[in-house]
């Protein structure tokens, strides 16, 4: 318990250096922090979701958080998680022992933080809600506080220095989480899940960050067109030179055939 109070302020300071937090609906949380048992049921997006919610709850009584047993395999991580109130739970085998322990702690007025989806969602949308949170709340006679954690990044996921909005909704009274008719237990659990889902969706609809504008594409810088190679001009077609009429040469005068006259026959 002493280590919890030593580590919690240190983690609070470090987290507020690396991220920007905004808490809405803190009055709903305070309305159940009066020694009564209560369960915080939150959506789950990032591994650090429980840490962020824990430092904003900042209760003088330690908040218990069920966490999958794989996270405790690393000795240092397991020690830190244990100091911060995490309790190992075997999700695949129906760990009734841990559920009973959490129920007893909740009955004593200790808050329990549960992620009803049972795992993180990659899309940011609510997954299928499991029954563990409702079983603990019903057995402990606890009120249930819906909690929505919203990341103000373009993809809705956690990034360094992004804005984080944690919204606490109006508590669901313990009386509405009791199953009086065991023959209709499944129908009663379905009704509770639908009620919680509607509350969580409404918290998102009323407190979502405005959509960030898509990054404008810079206009492409037009490269100067390469100078076109000069096109060799085709030689002009050679016009045929008109034939000059060749003047006819005057025909040479025909020489008169000179027929040698026979000499006069000599007179006999």
Protein language model features and the residues they cover:
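Glycine-rich, highly charged phosphate/nucleotide-binding loops
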Residues: 20-24, 93-98
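Short, flexible loop segments at the rims of nucleotide/cofactor-binding pockets, characterized by
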Residues: 14-20, 42-43, 88-92, 123-124
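A secondary-structure boundary/capping signal
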Residues: 25, 42, 67-68, 85, ...
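Short amphipathic alpha-helix with an adjacent loop that forms part of the alpha/beta core around
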Residues: 28-33, 103-104
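Catalytic core of membrane glycerolipid acyltransferases/transacylases, capturing the structured
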Residues: 32-93
């Amino acid at each position: 318990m002493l280590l919890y109070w030593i580590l919690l302020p240190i983690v609070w300071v470090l987290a507020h250096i690396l991220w920007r937090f905004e808490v809405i609906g803190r009055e709903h949380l305070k309305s159940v922090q009066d020694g009564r048992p209560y369960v915080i049921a939150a959506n789950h997006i990032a591994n650090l979701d429980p840490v962020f919610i824990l430092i904003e709850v900042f209760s003088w009584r330690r908040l218990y958080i069920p966490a999958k047993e794989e996270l405790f395999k690393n000795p240092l991580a397991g020690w830190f998680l244990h100091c911060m109130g995490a309790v190992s739970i075997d999700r695949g085998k129906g760990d009734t022992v841990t559920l009973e322990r959490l129920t007893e702690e909740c009955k004593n007025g200790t808050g329990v933080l549960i992620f009803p989806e049972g795992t993180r969602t990659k899309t940011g949308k609510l997954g299928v809600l499991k029954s563990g949170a409702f079983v603990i709340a019903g057995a402990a006679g606890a009120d249930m506080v819906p909690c929505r954690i919203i990341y103000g990044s373009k993809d809705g996921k956690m990034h360094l220095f992004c804005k984080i909005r944690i919204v606490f909704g109006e508590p669901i009274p313990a009386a509405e989480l009791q199953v009086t008719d065991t023959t209709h237990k499944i129908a009663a659990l379905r009704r509770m899940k639908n009620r919680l889902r509607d509350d969580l969706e409404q918290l998102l609809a009323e407190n979502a960050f405005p959509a960030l504008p898509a990054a404008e594409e810079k206009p492409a810088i037009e490269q100067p067109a390469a100078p076109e190679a000069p096109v060799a001009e085709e030689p002009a077609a050679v016009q045929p030179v008109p034939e000059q009429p060749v003047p006819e040469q005057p025909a040479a005068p025909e020489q008169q055939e000179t027929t040698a006259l026979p000499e006069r026959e000599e007179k006999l």
